[in-house]
Amino acid sequence: MSSYLFTSESVSEGHPDKVADQISDAVLDAILVQDPRARVACETMVKTGVAIIAGEITTSAWVDLEALTRKVIVDIGYNSSDVGFDGATCGVLNLIGKQSPDINQGVDRKKAEEQGAGDQGLMFGYATNETDSYMPAAIHISHRLVEQQAKIRKKSNSPLPWLRPDAKAQITLRYEDGVASAIDAVVLSTQHDPGIKQKDLVEAVREEILKPVLPSKWLHKGTKFHINPTGKFVIGGPVGDCGLTGRKIIVDTYGGSARHGGGAFSGKDPSKVDRSASYAVRYVAKNVVAAGLADRCEVQVSYAIGVAEPISISVTTFGTGKISDDKIEKLIRQHFDLRPYGIIKMLDLIHPIYQPSASYGHFGRKPRELAYTNSNGERVVATAFSWEKIDKAEVLRADAKLK
């Protein structure tokens, strides 16, 4: 019997890098409400007392970036100088320029379906049947822990009123013959008010954050718990560390369980294949696994700037496939249009649906409807996390001729 350990981590919405991601995606969403054809590449940096918004944006929309940035920061929980960062009073610096026309001529075409990729690059999508969300268990649990921290922190009459926004979680799982069998270690660090005793903090975090989330079947006498192991975490958020958009790409995806092409997601409109193609191949891999064609599936796709058709599509099922990887690849080419236009249409991506994805992972989330009013005053209902649907599983299984 082979045995090994595997670890993944997540960070809360109050982590400085995630603050930056959420601002970038809030800017993207606000622009898409007014201008669905906008080209957006928005980068954010947050540090003590300031948020800097930069990047390249081409749009007919007008957005009050200062007010929007402040709202995101305050909604996260940085609303007072007492916690070290106050969205109401921090400086907001706008350094946004326009997208290069050299790029634009390769993306926009007379025929929409001929839309070229916004850049060259390679992207990976992954799915596994070890959790109901088709996500690796370590990253799935890590996300739920920091999500629970925020839920308890924001709760009215919170049982943990001393919690602050910044937090991190890490899960180490033991695998036996490739199957997750136990939690070997749990690490959770949460920012807190001064004055809380370490003993009281540890007990409260165990009861209110860990206990509701950790699967009891995987806990055992030897499970190690490290809760605020430094003993103090008062200084956090943008005061403790500079935050940058796109610096948590492994947290955003599969926690290291799958490969990564290197491109970040937040602040990018769906013409950027770094984002849209990564969503598409997650959709593909998840439907392959949901169809029962494999227990694990990783799909790679690559593009050339200005070219519509993918340069390559490859599939790996790590020996878990019920049919050959070659046959799965043929089914993917048959049922999924992985041109940029095809992806945008297939997943209905030109809507303000992105800010929710900027914390707690872009994958493994439940699709949900979001309503908004567009620039014509019309009410529109869009689906966030549309790439998490498994609506192609049945036809894939049928065409694979699996019983």
Curated annotation (Swiss-Prot):
- Amino-acid positions noted as binding L-methionine in the UniProt annotation, renumbered to this chain: 56, 99, 241, 272
Coiled coil regions, renumbered to chain:
none
Q: What is any one GO biological process for this UniProt entry?
A: S-adenosylmethionine biosynthetic process
**Gene Ontology molecular functions:** ATP binding; magnesium ion binding; methionine adenosyltransferase activity
Q: May I have one GO cellular component term?
A: cytoplasm
The protein's predominant localisation is cytoplasm
Quote the cofactor binding remark.
Answer: Binds 2 divalent ions per subunit. Binds 1 potassium ion per subunit.
Q: Does the keyword Nuclease apply?
A: no
Kindly give the PROSITE patterns that the UniProt entry links to this protein.
ADOMET_SYNTHASE_1 (PS00376), ADOMET_SYNTHASE_2 (PS00377)
Chain positions recorded as Mg(2+) binding sites: 17
> Where found?
Cytoplasm
Provide the residue positions that the database annotates as binding K(+). 43
Task: Please state the Enzyme Commission number of this protein.
Answer: 2.5.1.6
User: By its UniProt entry, which Gene3D superfamilies does this protein fall under?
Assistant: 3.30.300.10
Q: In which pathway does it act?
A: Amino-acid biosynthesis; S-adenosyl-L-methionine biosynthesis; S-adenosyl-L-methionine from L-methionine: step 1/1
Give the protein's function.
Answer: Catalyzes the formation of S-adenosylmethionine (AdoMet) from methionine and ATP. The overall synthetic reaction is composed of two sequential steps, AdoMet formation and the subsequent tripolyphosphate hydrolysis which occurs prior to release of AdoMet from the enzyme.
- The protein's assembly and partners: Homotetramer; dimer of dimers.
Q: Which family does it belong to?
A: Belongs to the AdoMet synthase family.
- What is this protein called in UniProt? S-adenosylmethionine synthase
